[in-house]
Structure formats: structure tokens, C-alpha cells
């Protein structure tokens, strides 16, 4: 039994061991079919079809305003925070349509963590930042919380840097450390999927490298979907890449193929810098 459920059973509607039909010998974690999304009268996503594999890094690239961030925010339904949003189509997560209004968004966010563009630690201690999620899910035992905090900080490759200052305010960390703390906070709820929306765009090159190395470690246990403007980053760290343009998926393939032999001229034009 995991640390998160050792103190109190967390009730969810999704079975973490559900299996989907394999694609390239992988199981599908998200299967998006005929997704359309509007902000009011603006048609932001158009007929999106993507099958995203488990325990891979999937990069979403494309110019500003192409729908990258909108798409990733549909995967945990954060996009619904915009009052004028409406959608058609389906997004199945382990066989369940998350866009169905009967689907509990709280359950989804237990399985799907999110890391944002700018580090956003809570105005709390380092310890409390990581313990917050487990506490919300009913974990009260101090020993169990201590174990979760250490495991999560180790998973985010920041334990050795903060183990002697856990009671200090998280705002005292550097930008790169804050982002890794946010990743640790995400890991503490034991998600299956980690969504990353431009997670290194506000960081210096050294901190960016640390995050990229961490992503490669995390994909052994998690499915990672990352939005990035940095095409070199996408080429370095992802297994699959989707190129978005004007709200559409132009091309989705193995990253090596996208960057060396794209099948669509628009993809080649974008990655070669002819526009964007």
C-alpha cells in the first residue's frame, strides 16, 4: 500500500490499474477524439485527435496562441475556470470520458498533477507545501506525512538541498528550487500523469537543465505531457511531439521523426524557424 493511502483510504472513481489497448506496445493514458473547444465565439481547438502513451514524455509545440496551453488544461479540466468555455468531443483517461459532467473533477486531479510556467509555491514552509495535498486527502499521521514529504522531495531531486530547512518559508528558495518544490508537491499526491506548462521558461539555463534531467527520471514512473516554446528542449527530452497550429494538430509522431523528417511542410517550416 502506498504512503498516501496507508493512513486513510482515498476513494476515487478511477482504477489506477485500468488497462487500455496498447499503441506501439504502450498503454494509452489519454485518448482525445474530435475535441473542439470555444472561448465564447472563438474556436480555440479544432477536431483534436491525440492518443498519448503512458510513461513517455509527450511534448506539445507550436507558436503563441496555437492552443497548446488550452489543450493541456483540458486534460485536468482547469480550462473550465473560464466561464465562456464550451467543448464537444471526448477525452478518455483510462477508459473514462473526463468531459462527461458526471465525472468528478476532484478524482481526476488526484491522478493528474500540474506544474505551471512560473513557480507557485504556497506562502508556507517547505514542509507544508509538500504535505498540503496529502493532508487535504485526509492524511493526519505525522510519521506518514514525514515519509511522504521526504519521498516527494527526493523524487524531485531537491531533498539534499532542503532537508535541514524544511520549516523555512518556501519563498526563500531560488526560482529553480521553487519549481522543483512544486514538482515535489505534485508527486506527493501520487499522480499517474504530470502536466507541465512551460515549466522552465522563467528559469536560468542551469535550473532548466536540472528540470530536464528530472523529467527524464520521472518518466520511469509517470506519464508526462509538457508544453514548450523551446524546440531544442522538446527534441532533447520528449518521446513524442505534437505540433499545434491555429488550434489544430498538424502532426503528431515520434520526436526524432518530427525533427528530422516531418511529413507536413508546415511542421518543417516551424521547426526550421521560418515562422513562429
From Swiss-Prot:
Domain of life: Bacteria
Keyword Transport belongs to the record: yes
Membrane topology: Peripheral membrane protein
UniProt cross-references to SMART domains, sorted A to Z: AAA
CDD domains: ABC_PstB_phosphate_transporter (cd03260)
One GO cellular component term: plasma membrane
Catalytic activity: phosphate(out) + ATP + H2O = ADP + 2 phosphate(in) + H(+)
Localization, UniProt: Cell membrane
Binding-site positions, ATP: 62-69
GO biological process, one term: phosphate ion transmembrane transport
Keywords: ATP-binding, Cell membrane, Membrane, Nucleotide-binding, Phosphate transport, Translocase, Transport
Transcription found in the keyword field: no
Main location: membrane
Enzymatic class: translocase
Residues covered by the ABC transporter domain: 23-271
One Pfam family in the UniProt entry: ABC_tran
EC number: 7.3.2.1
MF GO annotations: ATP binding; ATP hydrolysis activity; ATPase-coupled phosphate ion transmembrane transporter activity
Subunit structure: The complex is composed of two ATP-binding proteins (PstB), two transmembrane proteins (PstC and PstA) and a solute-binding protein (PstS).
Function: Part of the ABC transporter complex PstSACB involved in phosphate import. Responsible for energy coupling to the transport system.
Family membership noted in the UniProt record: Belongs to the ABC transporter superfamily. Phosphate importer (TC 3.A.1.7) family.
Protein name (record): Phosphate import ATP-binding protein PstB
Annotated source species: Oceanobacillus iheyensis (strain DSM 14371 / CIP 107618 / JCM 11309 / KCTC 3954 / HTE831)
Amino acid at each position: 500500500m502506498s504512503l498516501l493511502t496507508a493512513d486513510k483510504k482515498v476513494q476515487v472513481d478511477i482504477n489506477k490499474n485500468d488497462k487500455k489497448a496498447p499503441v506501439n506496445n504502450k498503454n494509452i493514458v489519454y485518448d482525445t477524439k474530435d475535441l473542439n473547444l470555444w472561448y465564447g465565439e472563438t474556436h480555440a481547438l479544432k477536431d483534436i485527435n491525440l492518443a498519448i502513451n503512458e510513461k513517455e514524455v509527450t511534448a506539445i509545440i507550436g507558436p503563441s496562441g496555437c492552443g497548446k496551453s488550452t489543450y493541456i488544461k483540458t486534460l485536468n479540466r482547469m480550462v473550465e475556470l473560464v466561464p465562456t468555455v464550451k467543448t464537444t468531443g471526448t477525452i478518455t483517461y483510462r477508459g473514462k470520458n473526463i468531459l462527461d459532467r458526471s465525472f468528478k473533477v476532484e478524482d481526476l486531479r488526484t491522478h493528474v498533477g500540474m506544474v505551471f510556467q512560473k513557480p507557485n509555491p504556497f506562502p508556507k514552509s517547505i514542509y507544508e507545501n509538500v504535505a498540503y495535498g496529502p493532508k487535504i486527502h485526509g492524511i493526519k499521521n505525522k510519521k506518514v506525512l514525514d515519509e511522504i514529504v521526504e519521498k516527494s522531495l527526493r523524487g524531485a531531486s531537491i531533498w539534499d538541498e532542503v532537508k535541514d530547512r524544511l520549516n523555512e518559508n518556501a519563498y526563500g528558495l531560488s526560482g529553480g528550487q521553487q519549481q522543483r518544490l512544486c514538482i515535489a508537491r505534485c508527486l506527493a499526491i501520487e499522480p499517474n500523469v504530470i502536466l507541465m506548462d512551460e515549466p522552465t521558461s522563467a528559469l536560468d539555463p542551469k535550473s532548466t537543465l536540472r528540470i530536464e534531467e528530472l523529467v527524464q527520471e520521472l518518466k520511469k514512473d509517470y506519464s508526462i505531457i509538457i508544453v514548450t516554446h523551446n524546440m531544442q528542449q522538446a527534441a532533447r527530452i520528449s518521446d513524442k511531439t505534437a505540433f499545434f497550429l491555429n488550434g489544430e494538430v498538424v502532426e503528431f509522431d515520434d520526436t526524432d521523426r518530427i525533427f528530422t523528417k516531418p511529413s507536413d511542410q508546415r511542421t518543417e517550416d516551424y521547426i526550421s524557424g521560418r515562422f513562429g
